């Protein structure tokens, strides 16, 4: 929270410095950019789209091949897309490719089926860079994107009851400095409790979480921020910079079904609308499938989701079930 009106360490503060593992990788001078592979499917699960960011860090113009190969869980090739690209020194290009897919196995909470996309750069037939991206084909539908009276959430055309949990990424004595083993332990606890959905309250968690949610079939409501707002040009630009990084790191995950822009939002409507449009530009499925939310306050997104604390911060726990059946509580953030 810094010097803002943010209340409480658990809600808004994030540590500074290095608090997660860091890896140094040596690459070829022409490489796929970090988080530079974007893969998604359309709302009919009939076509797959791939974008690959490649950049030439060398001093000479080079011609390469960009190859994207999708394989099923058994390793059988589904499609292979190839495009020749010429890059001047310092030049970055986004390579856009697409392919139909016939009778795909769909990712869901009961069978979280994952394909694998291998993205490669080839120079003189030699593979000089390669990135592997797990990918699940699925469709989702929210009531706020439909013009009907049905208040249910649909996954692959079937209604799914969302039974989720929020988690603060804090470890006693370690703050946010989770090891991979500690993330895995949290995941096991959440699954053992019977939850099928997760909200990372209220800032982006360790990326290993979404890896597990993809593999375990857990629906993911990812969060960017909580409460904070400064009406300065510097804050606006930095917020949008962090927003783009957040989306880029998470948009390939089939488990992600909600983009949570801010918890108990203090963002002005027009700024939230601007941020929502950035999300939709970076993630086309946010126009047709995924939703963008604030929670317990806020304007400018697809849905301001209510929070209900009956029996905790106040209210009557015996009325909780009845309250959740109300139309304005189809989805509840806490």
Where are these regions (language model features)?
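Secreted/periplasmic carbohydrate-active enzymes, especially glycoside hydrolases
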Residues: 1-207, 212-213, 217-220, 242, ...
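Substrate-binding/catalytic cleft of secreted carbohydrate-active enzymes
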Residues: 175, 184-190, 196-334
């Amino acid at each position: 929270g810094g010097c803002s009106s943010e209340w409480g360490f658990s809600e808004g503060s994030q540590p500074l410095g290095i608090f997660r593992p860091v890896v140094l990788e040596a690459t070829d001078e022409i490489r796929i950019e970090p988080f530079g592979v974007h893969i998604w499917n359309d709302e009919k699960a009939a076509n797959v789209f791939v974008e690959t960011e490649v950049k030439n860090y060398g001093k000479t113009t080079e011609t390469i091949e960009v190859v994207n190969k999708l394989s099923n869980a058994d390793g059988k090739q589904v499609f292979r897309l190839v495009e020749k690209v010429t890059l001047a020194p310092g030049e970055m290009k986004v390579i856009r490719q697409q392919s139909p897919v016939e009778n795909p196995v769909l990712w869901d909470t009961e069978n979280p089926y994952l394909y694998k996309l291998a993205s490669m750069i080839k120079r003189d037939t030699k593979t000089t860079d390669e990135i592997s991206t797990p990918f699940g084909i699925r469709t989702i539908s929210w009531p706020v994107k439909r013009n009907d009276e049905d208040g249910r959430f649909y996954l692959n055309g079937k209604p799914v009851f969302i039974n989720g949990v929020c988690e603060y990424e804090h470890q006693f004595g370690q703050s946010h400095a989770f090891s991979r083993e500690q993330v895995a332990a949290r995941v096991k606890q959440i699954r053992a409790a019977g939850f099928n959905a997760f909200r990372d309250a209220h800032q982006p968690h360790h990326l290993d979480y979404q890896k597990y949610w993809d593999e375990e079939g857990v629906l993911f409501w990812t969060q960017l921020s909580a409460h904070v707002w400064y009406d300065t040009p510097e804050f606006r630009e930095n917020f949008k910079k962090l927003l783009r990084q957040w989306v880029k790191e998470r948009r390939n995950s089939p488990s992600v079904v909600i983009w949570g822009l801010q918890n108990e939002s203090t963002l002005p409507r027009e700024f939230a609308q601007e941020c929502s449009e950035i999300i939709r530009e970076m993630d086309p499925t946010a126009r047709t499938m995924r939703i963008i939310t604030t929670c317990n306050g806020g304007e400018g997104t697809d849905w301001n989701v209510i929070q209900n604390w009956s029996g905790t911060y106040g209210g009557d726990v015996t009325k909780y079930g009845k309250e959740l059946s109300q139309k304005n509580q189809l989805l509840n953030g806490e």
